[in-house]
């Protein structure tokens, strides 16, 4: 869900992007769909049909907790999925966002993000929903990467002027706060194997630490509770 707060600032800093690598893309159709996240709650998927026949998608991440300054997800309320359904967001994707994006040539992600922010017209995406906007922006990024004939990671590196590197996996090994029924003040205790020799080695280190920690907790407290994010 941190990505949703990040998208609020994306268009405002479009001047930071290197645009000479961008290739224009024309979007023929925009569709919203409901998918389920890892907790079994709905989130938003946006599909963009491009004029060359390619379809790209973007999925909005969602979290159990929301920061005070985080952009606002659009949820239905009511009884379906505990009030977390996204039919309103899907309707706005299929109507307002589709009307904005289709039939035009787009050449930069900052251009698209700024247009989405203007269409929304509120602070924190309260009208369209940050879940609608971030899924659209992710799909649009994939569309522009496709137009440039680049994998997404390389396209991001080129427009930001950054040097690609393998990510370091982060493991959430203990949960507290809103993520667990305990008295821990910290919501997430995470480890990152920064000096691992490879991604496979980093994953092994994370798994070894997780299971060793579980054994210590079981020995000391007699049982294990499973937090909202697996810790």
Regions found by a protein language model. Give the residues of each.
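Flexible, glycine/charged-enriched surface loops at secondary-structure junctions
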Residues: 106-112, 130, 152-155, 214-231
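Metal- or metallocofactor-binding catalytic centers and their adjacent structured scaffolds
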Residues: 64-150, 159, 203
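Conserved phosphate/anionic-ligand binding catalytic regions in large, soluble enzymes, centered on
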Residues: 36-46, 124-145, 168-184, 228-231
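Glycine/threonine-rich beta-strand-loop-alpha-helix active-site module
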Residues: 150-170
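N-terminal glycine-rich anion-binding loops that anchor highly charged ligand groups
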Residues: 42-44, 48-74, 88-91, 222
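Mobile "lid/hinge" segments at catalytic clefts and subdomain interfaces of large enzymes
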Residues: 164-225
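Short, Gly/Pro- and small/polar-rich lid/capping loops
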Residues: 19-43
